[in-house]
Amino acid sequence: MKPLSSPLQQYWQTVVERLPEPLAEESLSAQAKSVLTFSDFVQDSVIAHPEWLTELESQPPQADEWQHYAAWLQEALCNVSDEAGLMRELRLFRRRIMVRIAWAQTLALVTEESILQQLSYLAETLIVAARDWLYDACCREWGTPCNAQGEAQPLLILGMGKLGGGELNFSSDIDLIFAWPEHGCTQGGRRELDNAQFFTRMGQRLIKVLDQPTQDGFVYRVDMRLRPFGESGPLVLSFAALEDYYQEQGRDWERYAMVKARIMGDSEGVYANELRAMLRPFVFRRYIDFSVIQSLRNMKGMIAREVRRRGLTDNIKLGAGGIREIEFIVQVFQLIRGGREPSLQSRSLLPTLSAIAELHLLSENDAEQLRVAYLFLRRLENLLQSINDEQTQTLPSDELNRARLAWAMDFADWPQLTGALTAHMTNVRRVFNELIGDDESETQEESLSEQWRELWQDALQEDDTTPVLAHLSEDDRKQVLTLIADFRKELDKRTIGPRGRQVLDHLMPHLLSDVCAREDAAVTLSRITALLVGIVTRTTYLELLSEFPAALKHLISLCAASPMIASQLARYPLLLDELLDPNTLYQPTATDAYRDELRQYLLRVPEDDEEQQLEALRQFKQAQLLRIAAADIAGTLPVMKVSDHLTWLAEAMIDAVVQQAWVQMVARYGKPNHLNEREGRGFAVVGYGKLGGWELGYSSDLDLIFLHDCPMDAMTDGEREIDGRQFYLRLAQRIMHLFSTRTSSGILYEVDARLRPSGAAGMLVTSAEAFADYQKNEAWTWEHQALVRARVVYGDPQLTAHFDAVRREIMTLPREGKTLQTEVREMREKMRAHLGNKHRDRFDIKADEGGITDIEFITQYLVLRYAHEKPKLTRWSDNVRILELLAQNDIMEEQEAMALTRAYTTLRDELHHLALQELPGHVSEDCFTAERELVRASWQKWLVEE
């Protein structure tokens, strides 16, 4: 045995001072002194358990002792009665055996291949023992999971990565995938669980038993992220679910990972053979598959970027010529030719490397250089980790640990060790570059593009730095990285084929480049990723955004400006087609052309296909709404025009809905026979409120009432004859149904018909005579106020003229000023008590004092008060033109009318913009103080003082 170097002999004196009495210096062998000097982990362990050192001295580690691990552990567990005891014994056993492995490794008592085998089998032994103990415990608690035939179902565990390959390093995570064979339920328990529940609960307990730190440490850090759908997927999957996933969605990196997958424990059972046979076609293709080279090149590029980004210098695993590159070289041949060459299907690297040489896929010299380099690097890695049982592959910077490694690797000093290391890594790098290729030199533009790809593909952590986000604040940068990470997790839950992922990988760097250049990058990205989640399984939409950069830019600018638009696009991705043509996107349909446009749009849908008709109506409305909002955001539509467009659009929809309902009712019952004596349909739709006043907002509902002029004795003329008035009732019900039916494109409009005579208690459709009688003899003042903002939005000329005459007659009735003033004011106070002042320190733009409703009440009061003297006041139903009429007819001073108009349009404009932001209609208390003061003064003047 090589004597300790001078620095290590000096350090031995420090070790001596730590040793307890049973471990006196004179009682220790030279081997013990060497190992205790080299490894703080061994030192701490034998100080806590001196008997372990005695055992090591009397029974030194052997190369084949891994064959006894299972029996030794079973003996340790035989008296364990609870989970806490299980956790304790597993941790102590792991530590005891790791001390033996560290001893053998430090003194080179066994080969490096034996060390890797012992480390891997120790992990497998601990995992299987924990699984079997917990399976028995869970079966006692919940019953035994069985398939439909009553056969017990086991939990199979795939060990991935180095664990699967039998090449585990000294201090390592373990990558696992859990699976069970067939669906069914537990039998014999206190209550029945389905197998998915049983194995999920058991899997959670198994992870806890292995992973949770206690005063005895942990067994292994467990990583389950290699399972289908990653962290967002089920913890345990049935064989059928595994097969579906890998057949439909398995990605190249998952093939790469699955090469090393090994079933832990009994790997020759029926279910183990079934699982292996199921996975083999996914991993090893029957044809020679050269596409894998580019996939591995991409993965290596990601790793290289991570090394640069995280400053991982001196990393013997990830650095150029490191362990990972040897693994890549070997797996290139496995993935390209493994389906044809069974000798390449080994999970372990060294046997596969020998097979590669025998098949003359690499020269004997290259294969030998890789073998020697691999064993050198793995010994160096394991020695490095065994110093403190620490998961690291970065060479130390301190003198003590450098001296330790130089001595254990059998070099005189650190420079000699690093010289040999450099030679090995240079050999590896040469073979890697010849086989897989290195990144070619990039232009500045290509480098920038690469950085955006890195941002998308490399799953950066919050504390990672990347130059493309340097202009953002720290909070925004972290938020952007979190959004990207969350989006990627969400993608793992979705069924996205290879083509979809390919398109996404092309689209996302461009999208991130455009979004992250904005100051509001985080907010915009949050809206767009929410939208993308809804369309990732529909490759056509991804291709649209990928292939039409202008459409992508429009999408970004609209989503940045309005979460309402982002939500609409997310709910109804068909609207993405609208982004293709900026000429139509930012130019809404002419106000008088909506009916014609809709008629043309509906021609593409069969008249007898009601479902498609409903969808078409909704899709047309959403597309037009998007155009109006886009023009609003672009500033090409002032507030009055926005409402005009929204109102004309609603009228076109009403027209089409009545037409559809009419056709359906006539086909069923025929037409009411009184129509034989007159033109038209004898039916009208009256719009109240915002619709009647040309003041619709983006999310306004429609206040409608339905009128007819059908005589009492009229009947329909169809084969299924019904009463004429019954026909109009069913027509109105059908209209309500067409508006409110929820399809995949949502509803058309919320419709409120409670303003009809007698409200919700009244008939849904009213005869024109009954309506007139009600307004004259029963209606309340507030119903006459509502009539000020009412107009026919659909109807034949005869009924329209009748309604207009009734409206004019009611509004021009002489009214006693004080009584009217009191009734209007009291109604407003009731509304304010019910709707206003709900938000402390906020101003509700519509409902609070000085807001929009006050202006509406002022105009309604003045029309009802003075229309009997000035009948022209009844001409218009919208507030702005009523204010003009009040000024023109010398009821209100022009200056006041103009000021109220400005206040009204300003407040309405703010409501539109809040709707675009999906924000409620209230603002800070100190907003719009001038407008509110003006409205209060006008209210005082007309409704209090007069």
Swiss-Prot record:
Its cofactor is Mg(2+). The keyword Cell division does not apply. Keywords: ATP-binding, Magnesium, Multifunctional enzyme, Nucleotide-binding, Nucleotidyltransferase, Transferase. Can also use Mn(2+). This is Bifunctional glutamine synthetase adenylyltransferase/adenylyl-removing enzyme. Pfam families: GlnD_UR_UTase, GlnE. CDD domains: NT_GlnE_GlnD_like. GO terms for molecular function: [glutamate-ammonia-ligase] adenylyltransferase activity; [glutamine synthetase]-adenylyl-L-tyrosine phosphorylase activity; ATP binding; magnesium ion binding. The keyword DNA-binding does not apply. Monomer. Residues 449-946 are annotated as: Adenylyl transferase. Optimum pH is between 7.3 and 7.6. The enzyme is stable between pH 4 and 9. Residues 441-448 are annotated as: Linker. Involved in the regulation of glutamine synthetase GlnA, a key enzyme in the process to assimilate ammonia. When cellular nitrogen levels are high, the C-terminal adenylyl transferase inactivates GlnA by covalent transfer of an adenylyl group from ATP to 'Tyr-398' of GlnA, thus reducing its activity. Conversely, when nitrogen levels are low, the N-terminal adenylyl removase (AR) activates GlnA by removing the adenylyl group by phosphorolysis, increasing its activity. The regulatory region of GlnE binds the signal transduction protein PII (GlnB) which indicates the nitrogen status of the cell. Residues 1-440 are annotated as: Adenylyl removase. It comes from the Bacteria. Its EC number is 2.7.7.89, 2.7.7.42. The adenylation activity is stimulated by glutamine and PII (GlnB), and inhibited by 2-oxoglutarate. Deadenylation activity is stimulated by PII-UMP (GlnB-UMP) and 2-oxoglutarate, and inhibited by glutamine.
